[in-house]
Amino acid sequence: IRILYDDVVCWSLKKRFFKEMQDAGIAVRPFLEITFPQLASRINYRNHRKITVIDGKIGYIGGMNIADRYVEGTKWGTWRDTHLRIEGPAVRGLQLLFAVDWSYECKEVLSDSRFFPPVADKGKSGIQIAPGGPIGEWSNIAMLFLKAITNAKKNVYIQTPYFLPTESLVKALQTAALAKVDVRLMIPERSDSTVLRFASFSYITEMLRAGVKVYFYQPGILHSKTIIIDDELCSVG
């Protein structure tokens, strides 16, 4: 068992929390270890991935962290998120992402058949693992969303905890709505970040003006990052 965690997000956890796992034989490592987060020059270079791979054959990916709030909820209600279980060749993509991050942090290469066993096709749906990060000039995920929204014919449904779109994404959503595509946006009425909550609200008027339908999730905190286009393309992160 190997666990790679983000050191800034987990900075407040006691060292004994990780020591108990290490004593049980679990390899636990921080990603870009930080001694003082307030003074760190690399605080923005974090690992925000939520990946679980089992035996190289089963993968879980989405927005869920490992935290008590997913079981106990919050003072505002439930903590709503979306996570997927995948099987088949796409699991190799998840395993590769973890292996690259692990190699970067631990200088250990995970490449043999234990980690990448033969995997048969499963089902008929195509899955693409699209990693994002600060490497490279172009944001492949942002470009994928822009192209998909621009090409939408029937509907665009978006769930996000923080709606902070680029100007190009704003124009793409407005253009789609004005072209009579059913564009719907769901954001949380309450947020775990007051600053980001009000920043998200600042875009609502211009969305409504173009015909985008905006919904507020009220049962609790919405943390899901999901987009569905024409009932054919779905992205979860």
Model-derived segments and spans:
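Charged, low-complexity intrinsically disordered terminal segments
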Residues: 1-237
